[in-house]
Swiss-Prot record:
Belongs to the PsbB/PsbC family. PsbC subfamily. The keyword RNA-binding does not apply. One of the components of the core complex of photosystem II (PSII). It binds chlorophyll and helps catalyze the primary light-induced photochemical processes of PSII. PSII is a light-driven water:plastoquinone oxidoreductase, using light energy to abstract electrons from H(2)O, generating O(2) and a proton gradient subsequently used for ATP formation. Keywords: Acetylation, Chlorophyll, Chloroplast, Chromophore, Manganese, Membrane, Metal-binding, Phosphoprotein, Photosynthesis, Photosystem II, Plastid, Thylakoid, Transmembrane, Transmembrane helix. Residues 1-14 form a propeptide. The modification Phosphothreonine is found at T15. It is a multi-pass membrane protein. It comes from Ostreococcus tauri. This is Photosystem II CP43 reaction center protein. One of its GO terms (molecular function) is metal ion binding. It is found in: Plastid, Chloroplast thylakoid membrane. GO terms for cellular component: chloroplast thylakoid membrane; photosystem II. It holds the Pfam family PSII. Binds multiple chlorophylls and provides some of the ligands for the Ca-4Mn-5O cluster of the oxygen-evolving complex. It may also provide a ligand for a Cl- that is required for oxygen evolution. PSII binds additional chlorophylls, carotenoids and specific lipids.
Length: 473
């Protein structure tokens, strides 16, 4: 009678049309997974799984190196980075490599070196991946017990977690050392329009650093995305780096507490689901960060934020019309509100027109023109610098309006080329990928919990009444 219904009731993988198909010596019968399930076939083969992960890392680093060199080869120094579809060079520039005052690219050689180093690293990782996939031991527990593990070994799992946390902490400290001792980083707030600057006095005050975490994520509060100076950015990395390292050693030298042993599912698929959730959360934060923040993501490299481009337009026409004789303080727009300047709900002098909605936007090119009560009328009449005019005019025509697939954009280029601001690419892609990773988390978390409960292969139907009923035909 059991042959009357599909074996899929009992097995959570599809049955192959050709059950003799064997890929890499891992058939469905011996692993419970078909060839397209990929690394799932290697769940209990730590040596082969190591090979898969090292090879995967090699592919990632190869892409980084190859794309890096591709961007270097196509880079035009006379044009802003955000006009050239670049997504890697802006990050290197923000770290202070190859740039000078105003974000001008002075030397592309550091970018070339970065690409070559990534390619060399990818070759080493690729060799290691092939070796461990084809030649190395299938399992590591016997030959290399330090690198071996069992998914249900809770102490070993938290030790591995601790090692990862220490490595992440070292990564955070690498940025700190670069900013403080190895040439500095690019600071968009440096006087005169931004420059590479050594961060000599990072913020150590925990009330400031953790104050960001306690802020509301809504409206003008902005949670950690509201950080607006490099001292706080580097100070935050000191705190998070130190916390990660301390937490890492804690997990290395301790065993999980009883409540943790009870609360978590301890299996390979459960750890995968936890990781996917973490990456998803980071992707969502990154999407909002790159969309709104112009300190960590300087507009000189990533293009203006939406509010910044809007305010830049108001500023550009204020400058133009003031030169033509307009009285910027008293001129009225079609609605009776100030055409160039008006007051915010709390009394500050702000730009007028539609950009009033972005009245609390902060950007390096406009902050020098503010006084104790918003924009300073005297400074607007007498102290506007040429670099501020040039930058606002550039930002006005490069708003982040395009979509992920380049539809839309701003038709400000000749030859019908629509511009897509890198912030559009980075924010949209991270949001979409963050969503996919979250769905992956739900999928694998559900499977892991079902497996822990003992019914991942379907509920036992031996006692169902339908089994004793007459067949339909």
């Amino acid at each position: 009678m059991k042959t009357l219904y599909s074996l899929r009731r009992y097995f959570h993988v599809e049955t192959l049309f050709n059950s003799t198909l064997v890929v890499g010596g891992r058939d469905q019968e011996s692993t419970g997974f078909a060839w397209w399930a990929g690394n799932a076939r290697l769940i209990n083969l730590s040596g082969k799984l190591l090979g898969a992960h090292v090879a995967h890392a090699g592919l990632i680093v190869f892409w980084a190196g190859a794309m890096n060199l591709f961007e270097v080869a196509h880079f035009v120094p006379e044009k802003p980075m955000y006009e050239q579809g670049l997504i890697l060079l802006p990050h290197l520039a923000a770290l202070g490599y190859g740039v000078g005052p105003g974000g001008e690219v002075l030397d592309t050689f550091p970018y070339f070196v970065s690409g070559v180093l990534h390619l060399i690293s990818s070759a080493v990782l690729g060799f290691g991946g092939v070796y461990h996939s084809l030649i190395g031991p299938e399992t590591l527990e016997e030959s290399y017990p330090f690198f071996g593990y069992l998914w249900k070994d809770k102490n070993k799992m938290t030790t591995i977690l601790g090692i990862h946390l220490v490595l992440l902490g070292i990564g955070a400290w690498l940025l700190v050392w670069k900013a403080m001792y190895f040439g500095g980083v690019y600071d968009t707030w440096a006087p005169g329009g931004g420059d590479v600057r050594v961060i000599s006095y990072p913020t150590y005050d925990p009330s400031v650093i953790f104050g960001y975490l306690l802020k509301s994520p809504f409206g003008g509060d902005g949670w950690i995305i509201s950080v607006d100076n490099m001292e706080d950015v580097i100070g935050g990395h000191i705190w998070i780096g130190t916390t990660l390292i301390i937490g890492g050693f804690f997990h290395i030298f301790t065993k999980p507490f009883a409540w943790a042993r009870r609360a978590f599912v301890w299996s390979g698929e459960a750890y995968l689901s936890y990781s996917l959730a973490s990456v998803s959360l980071m992707a969502f934060i990154a999407a909002v960060f790159v969309w709104f923040n112009n300190t960590v993501y300087p507009s000189e490299f990533f293009g203006p934020t939406g509010p910044e481009a809007s305010q830049a337009q108001a500023f550009t026409f204020l400058v133009r019309d003031q030169r033509l004789g307009a009285n910027i303080a008293s001129a009225q727009g079609p609605t009776g509100l100030g055409k160039y300047l008006m007051r915010s709900p709390t009394g500050e002098i702000i730009f007028g027109g539609e950009t009033m909605r972005f009245w609390d936007m902060r950007a390096p090119w406009v902050e020098p023109l503010r006084g104790p009560n918003g924009l300073d009328l005297s400074k607007l009449k007498n102290d506007i610098q040429p670099w501020q005019e040039r930058r606002s005019a550039e930002y006005m025509t490069h708003a982040p309006l395009g979509s992920l697939n380049s539809v839309g954009g701003v038709a400000t280029e000749i030859n019908s080329t629509n511009f897509v601001n890198p912030r559009s690419w980075l924010a949209t892609s991270h949001y979409v990928l963050g969503f996919f990773f979250f769905v992956g988390h739900l999928w694998h978390a559900g499977r892991a919990r079902a497996a822990a409960a003992g019914f991942e292969k379907g509920i036992d139907r031996d006692t169902e009444p339908v089994l004793s009923m007459r067949p339909l035909d």
